[in-house]
């Protein structure tokens, strides 16, 4: 059983927050991660900055822009990841990254370095699972015992969901709405049934993300999803308070605690 799989061994839904590494600087991200994990995160997503984040909304796009205002360093990304892992070795860390930064480094070198830094899962929004590149990469990840986490959207066909079973591990990231990341006022109609269907077809835990921001939304989704993923709302706190580290730490801890307390 992988470290990620073990998190889902209880009946309680898992809180999975996301932060963009490098915003406003690399060192602060260690504090952000620590606050979120102490507040109740069961898994932590770490975003690798990229100049063309096609799946991300304005909040995360701005976070990447702030991070990339400084020279981008994959070496620094890996070092900060290792520091977070050292603080909380019990909490699985997952990279959410576009394919280009990995390809630029070299897939084998990246996989080895990510594993050594404490990464237990990867989400790559712009790498379809049914490509030769994905199949080759999946084999590398399997050897390193890193989970390859795939996205399912409202538009993904049932046939494609079934095909995903052979190339996915850890959990499925279910995108709750069309469009890019960002906060939404209401949840999609039929979300519960769709998540249950995906879980039955793939045989993995299903975590819901995109558009979730409030404790009430997290409470509702946690009754039928194995995990609740929140990115833009977390990153918004960092955008507004990141210049004052202690204030931001307090706000992130409070927010995480409220979300975790609301979940079933």
Swiss-Prot record:
SUPFAM superfamilies assigned to the protein according to its UniProt record, in alphabetical order: Ribulose-phoshate binding barrel
Active-site residues, record numbering mapped to chain: 45 (proton acceptor), 56 (proton acceptor)
A GO term from the CC aspect: cytosol
Keywords assigned by UniProt, alphabetized: Amino-acid biosynthesis, Aromatic amino acid biosynthesis, Lyase, Tryptophan biosynthesis
Keyword field contains Iron-sulfur: no
Chain segments annotated as transmembrane: none
Catalyzed chemical reaction(s): (1S,2R)-1-C-(indol-3-yl)glycerol 3-phosphate + L-serine = D-glyceraldehyde 3-phosphate + L-tryptophan + H2O
EC class name: lyase
Quaternary organization: Tetramer of two alpha and two beta chains.
PANTHER family (UniProt xref): TRYPTOPHAN SYNTHASE ALPHA CHAIN, CHLOROPLASTIC, TRYPTOPHAN SYNTHASE, ALPHA CHAIN
Function recorded in the entry: The alpha subunit is responsible for the aldol cleavage of indoleglycerol phosphate to indole and glyceraldehyde 3-phosphate.
Name used for this protein in its record: Tryptophan synthase alpha chain
Phylogenetic lineage: Bacteria, Pseudomonadati, Spirochaetota, Spirochaetia, Leptospirales
Gene name linked to the record: trpA
């Amino acid at each position: 059983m992988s470290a990620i799989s073990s998190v889902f061994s209880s009946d309680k839904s898992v809180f999975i927050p996301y932060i963009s590494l490098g915003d406003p600087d690399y060192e602060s991200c260690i504090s952000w991660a620590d606050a979120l994990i102490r507040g109740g995160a069961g898994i932590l997503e770490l975003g690798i900055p990229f100049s063309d984040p096609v799946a991300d909304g304005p909040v995360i796009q701005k976070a990447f822009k702030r991070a990339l205002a400084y020279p981008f360093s994959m070496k620094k990304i890996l070092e900060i990841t290792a520091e977070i892992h050292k603080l909380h070795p019990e909490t699985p860390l997952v990279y959410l990254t576009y394919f280009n930064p990995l390809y630029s480094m070299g897939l084998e070198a990246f996989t080895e370095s990510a594993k050594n830094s404490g990464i237990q899962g990867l989400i790559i929004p712009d790498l379809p699972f049914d490509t030769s590149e994905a199949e080759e990469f999946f084999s590398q990840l399997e050897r390193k015992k890193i989970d390859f986490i795939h996205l399912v959207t409202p538009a993904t066909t049932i046939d494609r969901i079934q095909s995903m079973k052979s190339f996915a591990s850890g959990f499925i990231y279910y995108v709750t709405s069309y469009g890019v990341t960002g906060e939404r006022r209401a949840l999609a109609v039929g979300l519960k049934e769709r998540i249950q269907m995906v879980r039955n077809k793939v045989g993995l835990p299903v975590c819901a993300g995109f558009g979730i921001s409030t404790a009430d939304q997290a409470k509702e989704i946690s009754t039928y999803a194995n995990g609740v993923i929140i990115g833009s709302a977390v990153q918004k706190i960092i955008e507004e308070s990141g210049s004052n580290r202690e204030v931001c730490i307090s706000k992130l801890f409070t927010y995480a605690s409220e979300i975790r307390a609301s979940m079933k």
